[in-house]
Amino acid sequence: MSAEERLIELEIRVAEQEKTIDELSSVLTEQWKTVDQLSKKLNALTNRFLELKEQAAPDVPVTKPPHW
């Protein structure tokens, strides 16, 4: 394999790797959006659950654990 052929092969590999990195970056961005949406929904559901629990037993205060 000549030096020129090796250079072409390396350039092809770099181009393929750049494409893969771009694709992975896009997927990661979409996953973070999904995680953020799910986190917001979980917080809303947790708050709603605590409200309903308080309504069911109004004389017993419900507080979130310290790690919330």
Swiss-Prot record:
Disulfide bonds: none annotated. InterPro entries: SlyX. PANTHER family: PROTEIN SLYX (PTHR36508:SF1). Belongs to the SlyX family. This is Protein SlyX homolog. The lineage of its organism: Bacteria, Pseudomonadati, Pseudomonadota, Alphaproteobacteria, Hyphomicrobiales.
